[in-house]
Amino acid sequence: MQDVLNHLSRQLRSFTLALCLGLTLLLTACGDSVSMLTGDYVEDTVAVVHTLQTTLALPADAEGLQDSEREAHDLINDYMSRYRPQPRVNGLSSFTTMQTALNSLQGHYNTYTNRPVPDDLRARVDKELGKAEKAVLRGT
């Protein structure tokens, strides 16, 4: 009798644990991620440019650099997934310039996760971000 109760107790604990883990995964996967994007292309582009320029300006030994780079990585994903499929936006010169800068930076973050952004890449991306910001403010 005791063996049967122990077996049932073990099964109940396993089932409860599996249920809790499943619900946790379901709720976190379906939750709306907090994003700084507003849906306004001009505002979002300027905000992303400023955020990325701030992240790029951090020294290699800055406290919180990895967190900033991780947030930049997520921001790039959010921005591109929002605006790449929109034909009214992705034909603009500001978007293509922005896309070039973001692809370069994202490529570095994906390939060299724990390494600082090289100076030449930093300068090129910063220049392209500046061009994209000027173009979007002009309306092109």
List the predicted regions and their residue ranges:
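Bacterial N-terminal signal peptides that target proteins for export
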Residues: 3-19
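Bacterial signal peptide processing site
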Residues: 31-34
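Alpha-helical segments in soluble extracytoplasmic regions
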Residues: 37-91
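Short, charged, amphipathic alpha-helical segments
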Residues: 66-73, 92-100, 119-130
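Long, amphipathic, charge-rich alpha-helical segments that form helical bundles/coiled-coils
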Residues: 82-116
